[in-house]
Amino acid sequence: MRKEELRTYIENHESEMIEDLKSLIRIPSEKQAAEPGKPFGAPAAEALAQGIEILEKYGFAVTNYDNYAIAADFNQEEKGLDILAHLDVVPAGEGWQETDPFIPLIKEGKMFGRGTADDKGPAIAAIYAMRAVKELGYPLKKNVRLVLGSDEECGSSCLLYTSPSPRDGLLSRMPSSA
């Protein structure tokens, strides 16, 4: 029953999901020189700001860790599931054949653009999973925390700033690391 309900929910929100992903792909969030308040450069900070906008649009309270990373909690429980994803991308370089790397394109049912698989697409999938659970009213006994970093491609130093001490989550992984 819930599986079918979730499938229907995702199908009904597919166009929103695609637009949210496109909004992230358009940001060339390659690591750049630090600026005041933007430790990994302006594009990385812009990607985090877009992540905040998306999460807040769906009713999640978001903590911004000084533009190193952001985190959204499903509820106020202390321990639970941590989902880690990132909004930075490796430099575009050569080899793109379908589209400009930062202009999203859907062709034959597939989306092309920098970050669709690593890791903006999985980040959007995680946001929509949390949104579906919330909007469908599924009760959770523990918290789910989504942490979106901005420096994974260059060492993940962004995650050092997400909490004064490491959380005791039951599982921490990136959605793209299945």
Regions found by a protein language model. Name each.
Residues 34-37, 116, 158:
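Short acidic, glycine/proline-rich loop/turn micro-motifs
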Residues 80-148:
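Active-site metal-coordination/substrate-binding segment of hydrolases
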Residues 91-93, 157, 172:
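Glycine/Thr-rich phosphate-binding loops of Rossmann-like dinucleotide-binding domains
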Residues 161-166:
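Conserved small/polar residues in nucleotide/adenosyl-binding loops
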Residues 172-178:
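Hydrophobic alpha-helical segments, chiefly the membrane-spanning helices
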